[in-house]
UniProtKB/Swiss-Prot annotation:
UniProt membrane topology term: Multi-pass membrane protein
Family of the protein in this entry: Belongs to the chemokine-like factor family.
Transmembrane segments: 41-61, 70-90, 105-125, 147-167
A GO BP annotation: chemotaxis
Annotated compartments: Membrane
Keyword Transmembrane helix: yes
Keywords: Chemotaxis, Cytokine, Membrane, Transmembrane, Transmembrane helix
GO CC terms: extracellular space; membrane; nucleoplasm
Domain (MARVEL) ranges: 36-168
Example of a GO MF term: cytokine activity
Organism, scientific name: Mus musculus
Designated name of the protein: CKLF-like MARVEL transmembrane domain-containing protein 8
Length: 173
């Protein structure tokens, strides 16, 4: 009987790595930049999030799948809305200062430039697909989404400008 109990017992050894210790100390200090929301790029990002949310919710609340062009508009609106929320979190929490390997000014310029171009194409597709004859009861939602899509495009154009200024000043050094 004692032999069976000895066979069942085993020794557990635990070790800690320096990575785990470093991780716990760095995650306890949480930085927050509330002044970012008062800068022009910060205000534009908030406007992009609010207006972008309006674009895709106004379309999602309709039978948009009957008009294939709205699939493109939905893809662009949701994709860039999620990424813009991600970038807002990165900027507010100062995560970009903890990851210096990433060229954040170049990433911001590429992101905002691509968002401007693709949102502009989506806004044109959105506006050209709005017709009271196709789906009369969806007309108002689609027309409003088209209007807000152009406003989001203007916001991304403004952020592209500010990103370009930051990128140019960074590369000139």
């Amino acid at each position: 009987m004692e032999e069976q109990q000895r066979a069942r017992s085993h020794t557990v050894t635990t070790t800690t790595s320096s990575f785990a210790e470093n991780f716990s100390t760095t995650s306890s200090s949480f930085a927050y930049d509330r002044e970012f929301l008062r800068t022009p790029p910060g205000l534009l990002i908030v406007a992009e999030i609010v207006l972008g949310l309006l674009v895709w919710t106004l379309i999602a609340g309709t039978e948009y799948f009957r008009v294939p062009a709205f699939g493109w508009v939905m893809f662009v609106a949701v994709f860039y809305w999620v990424l813009t929320v991600f970038f807002l979190i990165v900027y507010i929490t100062l995560t970009y200062t903890r990851i210096p390997q990433v060229p954040w000014t170049t990433v911001g310029l590429c992101f905002n430039g691509s968002a401007f171009v693709l949102y502009f194409s989506a806004a044109i597709v959105d506006a050209s697909s709005v017709s009271p004859e196709k789906e009369g009861h969806n007309f108002n939602s689609w027309a409003a989404s088209s209007f807000f899509a152009f406003l989001v495009t203007i916001c991304y154009a403004g952020n592209t400008y500010f990103s370009f200024i930051a990128w140019r000043s960074r590369t000139a050094q």
